[in-house]
Regions:
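Start-transfer (signal-anchor) and selected internal transmembrane alpha helices
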Residues: 1-27
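Short secondary-structure boundary segments
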Residues: 3-8, 70-80, 185-195
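Hydrophobic alpha-helical segments and their boundary regions
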Residues: 7, 13, 19, 49, ...
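Membrane-interface starts of transmembrane alpha-helices
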Residues: 11-15, 90-99, 120-128, 174
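Membrane-interface coil-to-helix junctions
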Residues: 23-114, 118, 130-157
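Membrane-embedded helix bundles of polyisoprenyl
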Residues: 110-117, 122-210
Length: 211
């Protein structure tokens, strides 16, 4: 009886995770057959990072600049490894499924957290999360190979939810959660989406201070 009482509060969330997993694999079922989504930008990215990888393998050092694009640009925008970056391990764990299954699952889970923070019931939040993640824009950018953009969008929703929870509910728990998600957002390495998220949060912060 005690075990049942302990499980009951988290049961809707466990069901949500199961539903999101099933929907993600059902939509991208060819992944289960060993197939890979071939996207133009993913191929171009491998080509652009070739010079960086060759230098890394030859010298054992991490290059900070590449001449392979335009007249040269910082390597961190293309391919840079950070051995001391512990948040990378968390990101790898959260994206344990193969692409693009992992990003679809994360976008559902992230928007689910956002809706929960806004006080939406778990069952309605599941529906909203699926509707959000199955919007055409996600599949357009995945088809084009904009993987980092899709990942940043997936982390954007729970980050906004964390800020809202910090203001309206528990400041300490909300701040800790938001800090963790913000680190994942930065780890996604898509400054454009992070910039848009900051604009949304700035507007929300101004409204909170005024009202």
């Amino acid at each position: 009886m005690q075990i049942k009482d302990n499980i009951k509060p988290i049961l809707p969330h466990l069901i949500a995770v199961l539903i999101f997993t099933v929907v993600s694999f059902a939509y991208f079922y060819p992944v289960l057959e060993g197939k890979v989504l071939k996207a133009n930008d993913s191929t171009v990215s491998k080509i652009n990072s070739r010079e960086i990888q060759d230098f890394r393998e030859k010298t054992g050092r991490e290059p900070l600049w590449t001449n392979s694009i335009f007249s040269g640009m910082p390597a961190y925008l293309i391919s840079t490894k950070y051995p001391g970056n512990l948040i990378k391990y968390a990101d790898t764990f959260l994206r344990m499924y193969k692409m693009p299954v992992s990003v679809l699952f994360l976008s559902m889970a992230g928007f689910y957290i956002l809706l929960l923070a806004f006080g939406v019931s778990p069952w309605l939040a599941i529906t909203g999360a699926i509707a959000y993640s199955l919007s055409s824009f996600f599949f357009q950018i995945l088809g084009a190979g904009h993987n980092t953009q899709a990942i940043a969008l997936a982390y954007m929703a729970p980050m906004i939810g964390g800020i809202y929870y910090t203001y309206r509910h528990d400041a300490l728990k909300g701040a800790l959660f938001t800090s963790f998600i913000l680190a994942l957002e930065i780890q996604a390495n898509h400054p454009q989406i992070t910039y848009y998220a900051m604009i949304c949060l700035l507007i929300f912060g101004i409204v909170e201070f005024v009202y």
